[in-house]
Amino acid sequence: MLLDEGWLAEARRVPSPHYDCRPDDENPSLLVVHNISLPPGEFGGPWIDALFTGTIDPNAHPYFAGIAHLRVSAHCLIRRDGEIVQYVPFDKRAWHAGVSSYQGRERCNDFSIGIELEGTDTLAYTDAQYQQLAAVTNALITRYPAIANNMTGHCNIAPERKTDPGPSFDWARFRALVTPSSHKEMT
């Protein structure tokens, strides 16, 4: 995987307006794994792109009426077939974590990269998703080495509100695919 000015060369780019600059040009030091499906439990279609670009039609599905007002984004989405979609350059602050805290530090969006996996808490993720997540993570570690020691789920930084990536995410499998490091901590 190649990074070019914060973008993955291999990713389909769908620029989101929902981002801003990190404070004091802070480098990312945390990877947050999420899941998403729109409508819930359904895969494919244009809805995730539409949510992250602020163009989701609230009338297209009853669920969308409750989320159309949100201004949210992630850096990347990895679809079930392994396609990588990038919405925000990694050096910018995507709006994926919300109210959050990691190891006593609040406002995780300031110092994290958010990667969404198309899926649910209870359905197994695909081989292609694990392979692509590991490839992206290894590229990020090369650029932002602190990430090697700081990878977690949305459920761990916002436990009162979030459950993703859920029990269906196999952290041991992911860990085995990421470049070995003797000091890695992933929860």
Swiss-Prot record:
E.C. designation(s): 3.5.1.28
GO biological process, one term: peptidoglycan catabolic process
Effect after changing E116A: Loss of activity
Active site: E116
N-acetylmuramoyl-L-alanine amidase domain residues: 30-167
Reactions that this protein is recorded to catalyse: Hydrolyzes the link between N-acetylmuramoyl residues and L-amino acid residues in certain cell-wall glycopeptides
EC class (word): hydrolase
Cell compartments where the protein resides: Cytoplasm
GO cellular component terms attached to this protein's record: cytoplasm
Outcome of mutating Y63F: 6-fold decrease in activity
Listed GO MF terms: metal ion binding; N-acetylmuramoyl-L-alanine amidase activity
UniProt note on regulation of activity: Amidase activity is inhibited by metal chelators such as EDTA, dipicolinic acid or 1,10-phenanthroline.
Site (Transition state stabilizer): K162
CDD domains the UniProt entry points to: PGRP
Matching InterPro entries: Amidase/PGRP_sf, Amidase_domain, NAMLAA_amidase_2
Keywords: Cell wall biogenesis/degradation, Cytoplasm, Hydrolase, Metal-binding, Zinc
Mutagenesis / variant outcome for changing H34A: Loss of activity
Pfam families given in the database record: Amidase_2
Cofactor: Zn(2+)
Cofactor binding description: Zn(2+) is required for amidase activity.
Binding positions (Zn(2+)): H34, H154, D164
Effect of D164A: Loss of activity
Function: Involved in cell wall peptidoglycan recycling. Specifically cleaves the amide bond between the lactyl group of N-acetylmuramic acid and the alpha-amino group of the L-alanine in degradation products containing an anhydro N-acetylmuramyl moiety. Is also involved in beta-lactamase induction.
Family, similarity comment: Belongs to the N-acetylmuramoyl-L-alanine amidase 2 family.
Protein name, per record: 1,6-anhydro-N-acetylmuramyl-L-alanine amidase AmpD
Protein species of origin: Citrobacter freundii
Lineage: Bacteria, Pseudomonadati, Pseudomonadota, Gammaproteobacteria, Enterobacterales
Gene that encodes the chain: ampD
